A protein has these predicted regions:
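Catalytic-site signature of metal-activated, phosphate-bearing donor transferases
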Residues: 4, 9-170
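A conserved donor-nucleotide-binding helix/loop in the catalytic core
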Residues: 1
């Protein structure tokens, strides 16, 4: 089994491990796992879930699928069933946190100038408008509505901050 996720998609390790131990994921060729989505700050959590993380059976993966331009969507869409989307943890809540748009203004400008959708909209103007005022409760990417939550993880914009946890497994 292979887990496909981006660096800004962070698992709740304990809950994901519990789910792996008690779920029937091996009976599916591919799963899209539900995730929370955040914007601007790690405390701004969308009311709507996404499912960008993919868990796929290694035996079903082929190089054409892995190298497809649609990346994880292709992995899920092109593999045969059985498959499931919006898979949540044992408690019914997402096990992953997606921080794709949790960035400073400068980082967000850098992102929109470089990403594959840069010509879809006038992203630079949207970023400037977004940061001209406090967060308004909706994002300019999807138009999701948000709620304020206590961040699950500390995210520092000023510097890289490593906090040792547990025993090193080296």
């Amino acid at each position: 089994t292979v887990l496909f996720l981006d660096a800004d998609e962070v698992p709740d390790g304990r809950r994901f491990t519990e789910w792996l131990d008690c779920s029937d994921y091996r009976h599916n060729t591919a799963l899209k796992l539900a995730n929370y989505w955040y914007f601007r700050e790690p405390s701004n959590q969308a009311l709507r879930f996404e499912d960008t993380v993919v868990l796929a059976q290694k035996r079903a993966l082929e190089s054409e699928i892995l190298l497809h331009q649609d990346e994880r969507d292709a992995i899920y869409n092109l593999l045969p069933g059985p498959k499931r989307r919006h898979v949540a943890g044992s408690d019914g809540n997402p096990m992953f946190h997606h921080y794709s748009w949790v960035r400073t203004k400068e980082e967000m400008l850098q992102k929109v100038r470089a990403w594959g959708h840069k010509d879809d909209r006038d992203w630079v103007t949207l970023v400037h408008e977004e940061f001209a005022a406090p967060f308004r409760g909706t994002d300019f990417v999807h138009g999701y509505s948000y709620r304020a939550v206590k961040p699950c993880f500390e995210i520092h914009f000023d510097e890289i901050h490593f906090e040792p946890k547990g025993t090193p497994q080296v």
